[in-house]
């Protein structure tokens, strides 16, 4: 077989995303990006920054990585090492600048964390997904991303059946008197209508409704008998400002959900009032919010699914404990009686440490289902943890 010339049309036609090869205990992965403007003679592109969640991002405090051009071609490439269980999202950020980061990012033993974060914050709105990779979507921060999964990455229940038929969700407008705002809420049901159906409240509902629709996965697992017939309520965050205000330990948000939203939903799709049949699920600030709901209203929210919960809040980067950790230590709150699934990624150090700290406090009061995943602060990891967590929390309801 004749070797294809790097950068030729036939060479590009043979590519369908990153390429991996086994290398001792790990995999060596090569990323490719095709410069639409051609070679260095015709293109103004100086850098193609690679943002791999949990590897080259600000959560790892890693120095920014750029693909390098293969001279006299339209080919840019970068190679890195990944564990066999790794799963995560990535994107490219082509730039006409030689450097888009402050000097402090490249000086000293460690990049300056704030300068690194600020550099990525400015670049990410310009991110593009991998045109060679069919598995692409718009991430939670609004920019395009693509998927990379190693051969031994954990199974993600339900997500391998994207063509499963499902009942169309109903999208309503919730006008909140208490919060003085309005937002979309999706109501999704599986199985036959019954007042005994369990309830799941999913935070960041717009993501699970639109960016990475969860409906086929839930329908598939219900059809297989791995989830009970249920009512799912997906709550939109409105925007970043509302999310940052309403999700971190905000009593008004949860009072509005209980006093206003749930009665409205119940009139359309009856569900059980039992706390031990009710799940609150969230990621990042949503993970923090879900445990906050359970600790403060255990009579209503008895099952908590927290993924990459921001338990450092409100002290980002500080050495002191977050609010919920402090309250548990002081005995101001108790987790007794709650069923809790707690999950965090190895590649999100600040979040992982905060989760380990709150796990230590929760464990003294209550058994906790703890899961540490080989990934970062990443919806591609969360989607499997979401369905697995629902299966775990509702296991007693499966006949």
Regions found by a protein language model. Name each.
Residues 2, 24-85, 95-160:
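Aromatic-rich carbohydrate-binding modules that target alpha-glucans
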Residues 186-189, 195-206:
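Short beta-strand element of the alpha/beta-hydrolase
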Residues 201-268:
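Cap/lid segment of the alpha/beta-hydrolase catalytic domain
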Residues 205, 237, 305-314, 346:
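Active-site nucleophile loop of the alpha/beta-hydrolase fold
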Residues 228-231, 299-311:
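A conserved short beta-strand
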Residues 287-298:
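Short glycine-enriched nucleophile-adjacent loop
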Residues 312-381:
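The feature captures the conserved acid-bearing segment of alpha/beta-hydrolase catalytic domains
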């Amino acid at each position: 077989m004749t070797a294809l010339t790097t950068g030729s049309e036939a060479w590009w036609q043979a590519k369908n995303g990153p390429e991996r090869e086994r290398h001792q205990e790990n995999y060596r992965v090569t990323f490719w990006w095709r410069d639409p403007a051609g070679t260095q003679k015709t293109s103004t592109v100086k850098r193609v920054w690679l943002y791999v969640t949990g590897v080259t991002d600000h959560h790892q405090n890693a120095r920014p990585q750029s693909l390098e051009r293969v001279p006299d071609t339209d080919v840019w490439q970068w190679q890195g090492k990944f564990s066999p269980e790794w799963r995560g999202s990535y994107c490219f950020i082509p730039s006409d600048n030689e450097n888009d980061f402050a000097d402090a990012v490249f000086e000293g033993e460690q990049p300056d964390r704030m300068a690194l974060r600020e550099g990525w914050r400015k670049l990410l709105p310009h991110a593009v997904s991998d045109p060679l990779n069919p598995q692409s979507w718009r991430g939670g921060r609004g920019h395009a991303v693509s998927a990379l999964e190693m051969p031994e990455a954990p199974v993600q229940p339900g997500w391998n059946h994207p063509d499963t038929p499902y009942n169309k969700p109903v999208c309503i407008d919730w006008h909140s008197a208490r919060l003085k705002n309005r937002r979309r809420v999706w109501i999704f049901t599986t199985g036959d209508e019954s007042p005994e159906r369990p309830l799941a409240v999913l935070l960041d509902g717009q993501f699970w409704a639109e960016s990475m629709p969860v409906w086929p996965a839930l329908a598939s697992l219900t059809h297989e008998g791995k989830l009970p017939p249920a009512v799912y309520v997906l709550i939109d965050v409105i925007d970043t400002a509302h999310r940052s205000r309403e999700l971190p330990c905000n009593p008004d948000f949860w009072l509005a959900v209980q006093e206003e939203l749930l009665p409205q939903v119940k009139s359309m799709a009856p569900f059980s009032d039992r706390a031990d049949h009710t799940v609150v699920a969230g990621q990042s600030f949503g993970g923090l919010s879900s445990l906050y709901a359970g600790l403060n209203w255990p009579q209503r929210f008895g099952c908590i699914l927290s993924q990459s919960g921001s338990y450092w809040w409100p002290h980002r980067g500080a050495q002191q404990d977050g609010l919920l950790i402090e309250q548990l230590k002081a005995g101001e709150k108790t987790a007794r009686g709650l069923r809790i699934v707690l999950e965090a990624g190895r590649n999100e150090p600040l979040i992982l440490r905060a989760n380990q700290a709150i796990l230590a406090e929760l464990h003294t009061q209550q058994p906790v289902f703890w899961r540490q995943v080989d990934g970062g602060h990443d919806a591609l990891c969360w989607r499997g943890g979401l369905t697995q967590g629902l299966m775990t929390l509702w296991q007693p309801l499966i006949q």
